[in-house]
């Protein structure tokens, strides 16, 4: 060509950044200058820029690793590398060297750089527990670069000097390889003392982390044994819940809460670095994804090129490129997902901790355990799901943009068509997103209502069974479930719509685009332009456009859903904190206020009495422990106050009793003292915040008796023995099979009422607090036990007196008033009508004087317990060893669960085969068009469109059928089975099973089945069929590639066998480890008043952190092993791709370009599909555990109903009320008898009182009548019918019962009175009127008012339950200590109602107040589960030495003395 410059020589080209020509080293090489600057100086420069900052960071750290042989080996290797590089620099400076203009400078800089890196290596070794990330990355990449450079130097060497340079460069490559090995060696075995305890991941190097090798020990353990949480790796310090909470809470406190997404923003800010750490691997993954169509395009061109040295070199380069791209994709995918899940774990740890912390600071009215639990389960799960794809939002957007750009290069203006399809799909998705948050919120609210009612049911199982309300509760709760599922359908429709939009681009974009391309080319007269290369490159780009779009649609939907959950949690966090209106002291004591004149008795004698008694306590009581000055208290400041104008002073170390009629506000006053009730006016001041509290209904956590008593205090053996003795628990421990190691169950369900009350008392006493507040804490005890416990604790030598505690007791009974230093009387209006000592109040006349009480008679000093005896095994028995039932399905799995879902999918996979057939159809179309341009275009395009349309239609129909119809049906079925299992379970099950574990199945498991499992199931099965179809197509296209498939299948089989044996166990552990967390959360909220009174919030928050960390271990590791699976399967894809390209290179000329296109296109599609498959399958595998757990629960929890209990009973049974116990022995659990050989006959219409000391078996006898304990022998007949042969529900619905603990169901007054909806409104009103509650209920809004808004006191609740009993049919009434917790007036009302409304009934009454049963026809005395005496009460009283007379004498001793 005229005027053109001559071609450059190889030496000249090496002095530029250009790629050498074909004549220079085959044209397959870099120029030397490029290798020196770009591949040599650039990476070193980056490292040298970072190195000073890293050195500075390491300088301030303490040494963590000992200077072992490894350090000296590294130093030696680095110095050797520097010396060799120095020699190399000298040789490059010699005149004979064929160098570039940068050779001398580049080698000199590299030499200096190596010595600097030697210094960095020493610092990294000594002051970091992990191998250096920076040095490993540098050595890895520059090793590959140096290999390329060494090849160049050997190819261009033309003299001795050049050959020596090539040899020295080869030596540096060898030393770098050695250094890479040395720097990658982990330092776990050479850590200094005090630096041990790191989990494997925390000390793993880059290669270990990149390929998840640190998980191998876990896989070995999971493969060989049943795993427990304790077998799992500990969390590293960055995942500590306490640390995460501190980070998040600090930011939360600083920012204004004006935006509803504030919590989301501060979460992003708090965990920005972990979140951003996933950006580089995600960006690399996007870049590597788009190397695939470029490689495909080049491979198709290569398949048609002639065979020569140049093309052979290109072939080898393609093999190397495939290896790098596909392995790189696997590593970057694994790392980006792992970093994302690590961030999710951090968010979960921080947000759950914030929910708990906030819940512990709420007022009593706002502390709804079920609502908070929904946030911790359903909403946190939505956040976890939403953040899994958070990086896919920007990553997929970038990939879509790249795909559009590359499509434009391939198809020209025709690319507008698929872009238009993608845009329509995206806009449609964005429109639906605007509805997602609102519809999800409504659904979650419905879940919250159901869980709240379920939690209420679980806490009241004894009452539900006793009243025979199983059917009513089943109907009510299942109705809430059906309502919830119906509401969820609105959200599910959005899900189906979004899935359809996501698949639109994948199915229709290729059809429209190739049709448009062909039309444009035909109009330009280029019919032959549609060839193999264009077809398959375009199809690969369509895949890379459609899959990111599908992923983007799903990512947007889940992330928007997570935003809604963040908003719900933020709304919870923004609730007002509990405000403590009390004034607390700045120092130990202060002078009391002057008493304010009001309707009080000025009692100068009270001080004298207290002063006299202070002699025995040894401490001054002239300073007040509590002063209330003109204070008004209201639960709702906008409504009428409950307590008004109170002025009370309570001396330190004194014993004060608060009394008054039922509903006067005694409990409210105690809670006001605890700071739980808002103070509208006046003030309340405490001398100490060291307070113990025992509530009217005892609160317990699910723990052993000892743990319940010691609670958050430290264990003191002697003090513990004293407290146990004083609370009369020694005999109970002797009777219990495990002594004080007996687990009491959720809410103390395994205990009798008296035992529960005394354990709560023991906890209050054991804490040794300055102020002890007891809310009617002695009422649930029999007379003898009550007298003993009272004098042991409050008597002149009582434990509380000895430690000088100020004792404040609210009581419905007046019998202990003579012992009080001070008495405070509240009237019905909430005013303090009287205040002073008994003597002064008796003299003044009024409420107290009406009881006619005299001076007290203090008991002599109670015998001290034998601490040695209490510590012996006979009392404190350890748990008996129980065999752990290991479920082998945890390792091996249960295929039937998956088969169930495969059957649910039906014919949906057919669409997938049709969709994937389009690849072969395009091949046939392209071949036909090459042979006969525009010959049968309409035919091929029409069939192509038909395949896509049929596939799309079947997808929509299949998804709709499953998501809208089948999933709700299965969800309804699972709930019905689960609820039926719980309602049919025996009482022993609830005593042995934590309520949180049961509730977890109703919340977490059902939520996963409803929300996550359907999507995971559809996507998994769809993508599985795609993968199988693509493998078949690859085999058809390349018979040689098909040879490798058996090896691939064997590899995948081996992988899944190793993986599933561990993953299934982690899946179970993940779900099970949440149960203790949920139980703790629920327990703490139920006992919030007690916990705040004791000041245990910090200790329980620590426990919450521990339980959260405990649950985080399987949660985090489950996601980690899923990433291991992703990486491993990506390596299988890489192997397939490399095998295919090797065959293309080696068999070039024997394989057609069409077959190459089909095979390589399906490798790209397969790689995309396998990633989706792993994502979807791991989600499915995680969520299917919920079905396994529910099915296991329903199969393993035995029903209390026996096959023999099938006899029918007449409609009017029991018609008389004759009851006969025939040699009855009963037990809650095998070998733990509670009744022994009880024989008893009760005639129709008789009124029988059952008495005995606490724990004697009274309640168990009653429970046997309701068939709530199992009869080991004997039988019970009612009106001649053997109740052991009729259904238990039938018995309970025919016998009328009122228990000690009032049963109030969530809902309206009407629903509580008539759960089955059987009675007219008039009958309900009459029943309520008969107990004197109708006026109060009417004032609050009538029968349809929610019962929680009526604020019934304990006594009023008991009256309400008696009113409910009036409505129920049957001739047998059972009263289980029904009047033990009420005051004298309420007791009088109840006795009147019983006499008037149940005069024709047979009545069995368990009584602690023996005076209430003196007019009964018969009394039965129990001891140790046996009837020791029965007969007419008057006759037994007059019989000297009878059990009943002794019991009665003990209960009435005080009255007789007075």
Curated annotation (Swiss-Prot):
Glycosylation sites: 208, 309, 630, 702, 804, 879, 1316
Transmembrane segments: 30-50, 70-90, 102-122, 128-148, 165-185, 273-295, 314-334, 387-407, 411-431, 501-521, 541-561, 940-960, 978-998, 1016-1036, 1040-1060, 1125-1145, 1156-1176
Topology of this chain in the membrane: Multi-pass membrane protein
Top-level lineage group: Eukaryota
Key words of the record: ATP-binding, Cell membrane, Glycoprotein, Membrane, Nucleotide-binding, Repeat, Transmembrane, Transmembrane helix, Transport
Binding positions for ATP per the UniProt entry: 660-667, 1252-1259
Induction entry: Expression is induced upon voriconazole treatment.
GO biological process annotation, one example: transmembrane transport
Job of this protein: Pleiotropic ABC efflux transporter that may be involved in A.fumigatus adaptation to azoles such as vorizonazole.
Family: Belongs to the ABC transporter superfamily. ABCC family. Conjugate transporter (TC 3.A.1.208) subfamily.
Protein's UniProt name: ABC multidrug transporter B
């Amino acid at each position: 060509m005229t005027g053109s410059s001559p071609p450059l020589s190889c030496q000249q080209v090496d002095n530029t950044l250009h790629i050498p020509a074909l004549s220079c080293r085959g044209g397959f090489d870099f120029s030397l200058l490029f290798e020196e600057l770009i591949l040599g100086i650039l990476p070193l420069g980056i490292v040298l820029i970072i190195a000073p900052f890293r050195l500075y960071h390491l300088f301030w750290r303490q040494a963590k690793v000992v200077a072992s042989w490894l350090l000296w080996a590294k130093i030696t290797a680095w110095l050797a590398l520097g010396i060799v590089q120095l020699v190399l620099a000298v040789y490059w400076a010699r005149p004979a060297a064929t160098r570039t203009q940068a050779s001398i400078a580049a080698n000199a800089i590299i030499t200096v750089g190596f010595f600097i890196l030697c210094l960095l290596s020493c610092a990294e070794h000594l002051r970091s527990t992990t191998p250096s990330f920076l040095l490993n990355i540098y050595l890895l990449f520059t090793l590959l670069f140096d290999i390329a450079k060494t090849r160049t130097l050997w190819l261009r060497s033309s003299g001795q000097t050049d050959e020596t340079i090539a040899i020295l460069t080869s030596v540096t490559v060898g030393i770098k390889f050695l250094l890479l090995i040395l720097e990658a060696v982990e330092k776990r075995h050479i850590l200094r003392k005090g630096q041990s305890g790191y989990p494997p991941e925390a000390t793993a190097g880059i290669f270990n982390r990149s390929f998840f090798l640190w998980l191998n020990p876990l896989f070995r353990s999971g493969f060989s044994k049943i795993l427990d949480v304790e077998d799992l790796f500990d969390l590293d310090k960055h995942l500590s819940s306490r640390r995460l909470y501190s980070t998040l809470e600090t930011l939360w406190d600083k920012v204004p809460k004006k935006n509803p997404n504030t919590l989301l923003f501060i979460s992003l800010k708090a965990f920005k670095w972990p979140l951003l750490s996933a950006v580089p691997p995600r960006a690399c993954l996007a870049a590597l994804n788009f190397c695939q169509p470029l490689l495909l395009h080049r491979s198709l061109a290569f398949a048609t090129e002639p065979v020569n040295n140049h093309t052979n070199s290109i072939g080898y380069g393609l093999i190397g490129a495939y290896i790098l791209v596909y392995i790189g994709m696997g590593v970057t995918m694994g790392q980006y997902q792992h970093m994302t899940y690590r961030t999710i774990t951090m968010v979960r740890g921080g947000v759950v901790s914030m929910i708990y912390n906030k819940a512990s600071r709420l007022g009593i009215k706002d502390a709804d355990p079920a609502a908070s639990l929904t946030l911790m389960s359903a909403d946190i799960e939505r956040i976890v799901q939403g953040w899994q794809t958070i990086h896919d939002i920007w990553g997929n957007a970038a990939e879509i943009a790249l795909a559009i750009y590359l499509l434009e290069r391939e198809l020209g203006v025709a690319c507008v068509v698929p872009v238009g399809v993608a845009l329509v799909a995206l806009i449609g998705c964005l429109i639906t997103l605007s509805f997602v948050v609102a519809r999800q919120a409504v659904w979650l609210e419905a879940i919250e209502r159901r869980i709240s009612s379920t939690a209420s049911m679980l806490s009241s199982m004894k009452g539900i069974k006793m009243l025979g309300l199983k059917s009513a509760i089943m109907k009510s709760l299942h109705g809430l479930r059906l309502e919830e599922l119906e509401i969820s359908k609105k959200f599910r429709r959005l899900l189906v719509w979004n899935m359809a939009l996501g698949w639109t681009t994948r199915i229709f974009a290729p059809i429209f685009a190739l049709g448009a391309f062909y039309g444009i080319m035909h109009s330009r007269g280029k019919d032959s332009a549609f060839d193999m290369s264009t077809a398959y490159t375009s199809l690969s780009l369509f895949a890379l456009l459609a899959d990111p779009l599908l992923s983007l649609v799903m990512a947007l939907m889940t992330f928007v859903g997570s935003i809604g959950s963040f908003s719900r949690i933020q709304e919870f966090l923004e609730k007002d904190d509990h405000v403590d209106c009390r004034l607390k002291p700045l120092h130990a004591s202060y002078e009391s206020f002057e008493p304010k004149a009001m309707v009080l008795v000025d009692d100068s004698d009270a001080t004298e009495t207290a002063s006299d008694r202070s002699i025995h306590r040894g401490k001054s009581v002239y300073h007040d422990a509590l002063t209330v000055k003109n204070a008004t208290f209201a639960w709702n400041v906008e409504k009428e106050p409950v307590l008004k104008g109170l002025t009370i002073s309570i001396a330190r170390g004194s014993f004060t009793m608060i009394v008054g009629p039922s509903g006067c506000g005694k409990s409210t006053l105690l809670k006001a003292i605890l700071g739980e009730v808002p103070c509208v006016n006046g003030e309340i001041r405490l001398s100490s915040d060291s307070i113990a509290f025992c509530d009217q209904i005892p609160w317990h956590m699910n723990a052993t008796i000892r743990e319940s008593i010691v609670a958050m205090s430290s264990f003191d053996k002697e003090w513990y023995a004293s407290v146990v003795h004083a609370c009369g628990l020694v005999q109970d421990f002797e009777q219990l099979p495990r002594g004080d190691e007996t687990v009491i169950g959720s809410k103390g369900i395994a205990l009798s009422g008296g035992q529960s009350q005394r354990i709560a008392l023991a906890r209050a006493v054991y804490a040794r607090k300055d102020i002890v507040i007891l809310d009617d804490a002695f009422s649930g005890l029999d007379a003898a036990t009550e007298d003993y416990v009272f004098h042991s604790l409050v008597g002149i030598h009582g434990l509380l007196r000895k430690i000088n505690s100020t004792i404040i007791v609210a009581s419905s009974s007046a019998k202990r008033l003579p012992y009080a230093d001070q008495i405070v009387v509240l009237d019905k209006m909430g005013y303090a009508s009287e205040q002073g000592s008994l003597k002064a109040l008796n003299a003044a006349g009024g409420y107290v004087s009406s009881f006619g009480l005299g001076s007290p008679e203090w008991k002599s000093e109670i015998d001290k317990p034998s601490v040695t005896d209490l510590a012996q095994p006979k009392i404190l028995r350890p748990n008996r060893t129980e065999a752990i039932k290991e479920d082998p399905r945890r390792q091996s799995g249960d295929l039937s669960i998956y088969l169930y879902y495969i059957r649910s999918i039906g014919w949906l996979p057919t669409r997938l085969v049709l969709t994937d057939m389009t690849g072969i159809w395009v091949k046939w179309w392209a071949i036909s068009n090459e042979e006969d341009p525009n010959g049968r275009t309409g035919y091929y395009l029409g069939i192509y469109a038909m395949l896509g349309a049929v596939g799309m239609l079947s997808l929509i129909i299949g998804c709709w059928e499953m998501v809208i119809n089948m999933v709700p049906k299965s969800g309804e079925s699972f709930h019905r089975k689960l609820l039926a299992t719980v309602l049919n379970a025996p009482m022993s099950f609830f005593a042995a099973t934590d309520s949180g574990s049961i509730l977890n199945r109703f919340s977490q498991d059902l939520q996963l089945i409803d929300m996550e499992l359907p999507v995971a199931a559809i996507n998994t099965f769809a993508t599985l069929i795609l993968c199988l179809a693509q493998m078949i197509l690859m085999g058809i296209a390349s018979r040689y590639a098909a040879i490798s498939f058996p090896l691939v299948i064997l590899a995948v089989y081996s992988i899944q066998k190793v993986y599933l044996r561990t993953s299934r166990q982690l899946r179970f552990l993940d779900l099970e480890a949440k149960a203790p967390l949920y139980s703790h959360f629920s327990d703490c909220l139920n006992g919030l008043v007690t916990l705040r009174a004791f000041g245990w919030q910090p200790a329980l928050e620590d426990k919450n952190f521990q339980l959260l960390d405990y649950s985080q271990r399987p949660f985090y590791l489950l996601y980690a092993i899923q990433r291991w699976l992703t990486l491993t399967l990506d390596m299988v894809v890489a192997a397939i791709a490399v095998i295919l390209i090797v065959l293309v290179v080696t068999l070039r000329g024997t394989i057609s370009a069409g077959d190459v296109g089909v095979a390589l296109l399906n490798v790209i599609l397969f790689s995309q599909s396998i990633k989706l498959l792993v994502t979807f399958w791991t989600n499915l595998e995680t969520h299917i555990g919920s079905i396994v757990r529910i099915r296991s629960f329903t199969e393993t929890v035995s029903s209390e109903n026996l096959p023999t209990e099938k006899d029918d009973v007449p409609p009017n049974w029991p018609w008389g009320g004759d009851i006969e116990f025939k040699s009855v022995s009963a037990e809650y659990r095998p070998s733990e008898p509670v009744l022994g050989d009880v024989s008893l006959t009760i005639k129709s219409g008789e009124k029988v009182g059952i008495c005995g000391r606490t724990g004697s078996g009274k309640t168990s006898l009653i429970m046997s009548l309701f068939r709530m304990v199992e009869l080991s022998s004997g039988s019970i007949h009612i009106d001649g019918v053997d109740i052991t042969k009729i259904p238990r529900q039938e018995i309970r619905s025919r016998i009328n019962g009122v228990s000690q603990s009032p049963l109030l169901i969530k809902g309206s007054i009407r629903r509580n009175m008539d759960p089955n909806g059987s009675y007219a409104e008039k009958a309900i009103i009459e029943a309520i009127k008969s107990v004197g509650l109708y006026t109060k209920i009417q004032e609050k809004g009538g029968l349809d008012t929610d019962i929680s808004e009526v604020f019934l006191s304990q006594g009023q609740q008991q009256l309400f339950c008696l009113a409910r009993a009036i409505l129920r049919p049957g001739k047998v009434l059972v009263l289980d200590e029904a009047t033990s917790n009420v005051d004298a007036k309420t007791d009088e009302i109840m006795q009147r109602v019983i006499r008037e409304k149940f005069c024709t009934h047979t009545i069995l009454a368990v009584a602690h107040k023996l005076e209430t049963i003196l007019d009964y026809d018969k009394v039965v005395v129990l001891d140790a589960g046996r009837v020791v005496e029965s007969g007419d009460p008057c006759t037994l009283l007059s019989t000297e030495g009878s059990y009943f007379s002794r019991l009665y004498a003990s209960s009435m001793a005080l009255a007789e003395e007075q």
